[in-house]
A protein has these predicted regions:
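Active-site core of glycosidic bond-cleaving carbohydrate-active enzymes
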Residues: 42-78, 82, 98, 105-131, ...
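Long, K/E/R/D-enriched contiguous segments that form extended
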Residues: 17-46, 50-53
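Acidic/histidine-rich catalytic neighborhood
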Residues: 143-197
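Short, glycine/acidic-rich hinge or "gate" loops at secondary-structure transitions
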Residues: 18-27, 133-135, 153-162, 200-207
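Secretory-pathway/luminal and periplasmic proteins that interact with or process carbohydrate-rich
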Residues: 10-20, 34-40, 61, 74-79, ...
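Carbohydrate-binding/catalytic loop surfaces
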Residues: 25-38, 85-104, 159-179, 226-239, ...
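Short, small-residue-biased leader/transition segments that mark boundaries at the very start
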Residues: 4-5
Length: 327
């Protein structure tokens, strides 16, 4: 319908060829001090911009984002690598706010490197371009895994967890937060899949298999039947925070599914329902995708109709329009 046409037009107009990736406002801005500096927010926004790319057959529009990530991640001595070096880790990491020059600032967001890599893998999954996987995606995915090899620590149960992490954009910093665990799990799983495609079987892959076997997957059911957001702090029922960071495994990742384990799907439903339906446009779009994954078409449709209210915004936001296409 009309929203699909709008979404496709925005994608085609803001991300193709040798351009920079689509930012918070696509590429359209008419002021010197735009909201959030018209940057690349790594904790949902730039990723959500590209959710529709493959599923709407606009795969070529992915190129600017993939180029941006691979270039900055592998740039010797670049700002993303410097973030990792400050923590005595290989690889790279980013903060929440990032710009076209590779600058990264405001609140470190380590799991974003794993999240970005899921996009690199998704592009291969849709295109089956083995040359792209070998030359572009694999080098980034490998060094990102190495970052987490250096970063993860063993908890009291002998599982590997990400220390001192957050759940955007609220709550405490703890070890083993669901947001980080679920994304690192996806990274390791998809990197092993890439290794299988490329027939890579070396010391790195052996270490990856060993780490993956001990990795906490971030799926734990709490006292009121929900997917837990934190390990130590008890989740607050009725918390309407707009981020759904503890449900990364539901969407955009796929560890949670009724086809895999009904218990986790039901717990995800409890957690998602607790967030409520009211939110910003981009958050509502994310909820549409999550409810669709949980096979609740009526709830997804109701939220989608709310998200289509284009008169209810004060800032042009690309992710509002992109997020409603889920699969």
């Amino acid at each position: 319908g009309s929203e699909m046409c709008i979404r496709d037009s925005l994608m085609l107009g803001s991300s193709r060829g040798g351009q920079l990736p689509s930012n918070l406002q696509g590429l359209w801005n008419n002021v010197n001090n735009p909201a959030w500096e018209c940057d690349y927010h790594s904790n949902i926004n730039v990723q959500m911009n590209y959710w529709p790319a493959e599923v709407t057959n606009l795969s070529e529009c992915y190129a600017p984002f993939i180029t941006y990530v691979s270039t900055e991640a592998l740039k010797d001595g670049g700002s993303w690598q410097q973030v990792a070096r400050k923590e005595n880790c290989r690889g790279w990491a980013v903060h929440t706010q990032n710009n076209i020059f590779g600058y990264t600032d405001w609140l470190i967001n380590r799991p974003a490197n794993a999240w970005y890599c899921t996009h690199l893998w998704q592009h291969y999954a849709y295109t089956l371009n083995k040359e792209y996987l070998r030359d572009t995606a694999w080098p980034v995915m490998k060094v990102t895994c190495q970052y987490w090899f250096d970063r993860l620590k063993e908890n009291a149960e002998g599982r590997l967890v990400a220390p001192n992490e957050w759940s955007p954009e609220h709550g405490p910093w703890e070890d083993g937060v669901a947001y980080a665990q679920q994304l690192v799990y996806a990274l390791f799983e998809e990197t092993l899949a890439a290794a299988d495609v490329l027939a890579v079987d070396d010391a790195f892959v052996s270490e990856l298999k060993e780490k993956f076997s001990r990795l906490d997957n971030g799926l734990h059911i709490g006292s009121w039947g929900q997917i837990k957001e934190w390990t130590i702090q008890e989740d607050k029922q009725g918390d309407h925070q707009r981020h759904l960071s503890h449900l990364m495994a539901l969407y955009p990742c796929d560890q949670i599914s009724y086809l895999k384990d009904k218990r986790y799907a039901e717990a995800a439903k409890v957690a998602l329902d607790s967030r409520g339906d009211g939110a910003t446009g981009w958050s509502r779009a994310w909820k549409v995708a999550c409810w669709a994954r949980l096979w609740d078409g009526e709830r997804a449709y109701r939220l989608l109709k709310q998200a289509q209210n284009i008169t209810d915004v004060t800032v042009v936001s690309m992710d509002d329009n992109a997020g409603g296409v889920y699969e």
